[in-house]
């Protein structure tokens, strides 16, 4: 009997990707976040689709259309809360996924890693334009502050900012095009995610030890499908707890007020998942310098594969690198906290020190730790 799963042109692709895929037998729960990100993307596309049915991208009606969704549309409040908190879950999974990649040396699959960094940037762009759509105070002023950064680019900056705005300030044209971007970008993310998987399946998955796992592989189904299902249940549990019990805890109270260009909020700040980058941006008292640091904070991920100096791939057996990794984690949490604080002492100096340490750890200390560990592992007799 012919097995359709292995012969049908379409089923064959699914089979090789999710069923008969040879997978290392020792990958831990840290390898769950790829599938969870896929689920997050599906949730965001579905909830976003239903929100788009009722949303109007016009400055006069955008805010009231969001209120209408929450008050008058059947389960509109739930769809909106799932979408808003789904974004937070998306970024939580993203940060853990990237952290896993750094810890276990997965970045040495350069193509997969580079596509991943492009994916991260695209998701960040999508979240930014999406945050502008409710047209609350923080939506408007966040859009104004961030798009204004383009004007720091020498010579073409001002023209570029006005081109993005579609006028001389953030207004109706900006909101309309941001809605268009927010609708199209998730599909671009889906395409990039498929390419990400394509490159990953060229090499096969990494594993916690960092050693070539070819000698000991197991089929993806049922072992990892059941493991991913457990991760999915936990993700949905946390998302539902957030969306049903404290849907506004991660948002900004200022966004409950309609956008007013004549009234600036006392503290303009983005959503929590951008605060680390926002802190790095603010730590440099120069507009262009801040913009470059902001870009570098994400693009620095692209140089990590070229700075790998250790003889071992994973940090599993490298205590010095492990220590630096957890210092980097603590540093990012510190930056996130600083990004949400007002621009005054002692927050300014803490932010500047944390920003310096961020780049120092990735570009200097971690490569040096790799060399030091190589030296320590050499026989001394």
UniProtKB/Swiss-Prot annotation:
Asked whether the UniProt record includes Repressor among its keywords, one would answer no
State how the cofactor is bound. Answer: Binds 2 heme b groups non-covalently.
Query: What cofactor does this chain's UniProt record say it requires?
Result: heme b
Give the binding site residues for heme b b562. Answer: 83, 182
UniProt topology in membrane: Multi-pass membrane protein
Task: Name a GO CC annotation attached to this entry.
Answer: respiratory chain complex III
Instruction: List the subcellular locations.
Output: Mitochondrion inner membrane
Which InterPro entries does UniProt cross-reference here?
Cyt_b/b6_C, Cyt_b/b6_C_sf, Cyt_b/b6_N, Cytb/b6-like_sf, Cytochrome_b, Cytochrome_b_C_euk/bac, Cytochrome_b_N_euk/bac, Di-haem_cyt_TM
PANTHER family under this entry? Answer: CYTOCHROME B
Query: What's this chain's function?
Result: Component of the ubiquinol-cytochrome c reductase complex (complex III or cytochrome b-c1 complex) that is part of the mitochondrial respiratory chain. The b-c1 complex mediates electron transfer from ubiquinol to cytochrome c. Contributes to the generation of a proton gradient across the mitochondrial membrane that is then used for ATP synthesis.
Tell me what this protein is called: Cytochrome b
